[in-house]
């Protein structure tokens, strides 16, 4: 039960952070392209890969903290379902180039961010 609470609390924090990040991106850039979800998913991929690499390479991240951060905070923060919905919305609006750009930016951006975080954490760990 305690572990479930860790995930739920982390999820609440991650969801709040996702909302704030998306709201900021909407105000900063406007509604023409889903930059908020892109920012959330790329940064979330970086953070999750960093958390997992650090926790699997050393004892620095205890298992309960990893559960709170990875399954909880990052699970609440990143949003694959929004990515799919926004891509479909762009297609339905006839904005095929924007849909393709968003799809590629998300997939490649998230992979690149995860790779960069893994390399960074391994480098920092020596």
From Swiss-Prot:
Keyword Membrane on this protein? yes
Q: Which domain of life is it from?
A: Bacteria
Q: Which InterPro entries match?
A: FluC (IPR003691)
* Keywords noted in UniProt: Cell inner membrane, Cell membrane, Ion channel, Ion transport, Membrane, Metal-binding, Sodium, Transmembrane, Transmembrane helix, Transport
A GO cellular component annotated for this chain's UniProt record is: plasma membrane
- Membrane topology, as annotated: Multi-pass membrane protein
Catalytic activity, per the record? fluoride(in) = fluoride(out)
Localization, UniProt: Cell inner membrane
Q: What molecular functions are annotated in GO for this chain?
A: fluoride channel activity; metal ion binding
UniProt record similarity statement = Belongs to the fluoride channel Fluc/FEX (TC 1.A.43) family.
**Which purpose does this protein serve, as stated in its record?**
Fluoride-specific ion channel. Important for reducing fluoride concentration in the cell, thus reducing its toxicity.
Q: Under what name is this protein listed?
A: Fluoride-specific ion channel FluC
Which species is listed as the source?
A: Anaeromyxobacter dehalogenans (strain 2CP-1 / ATCC BAA-258)
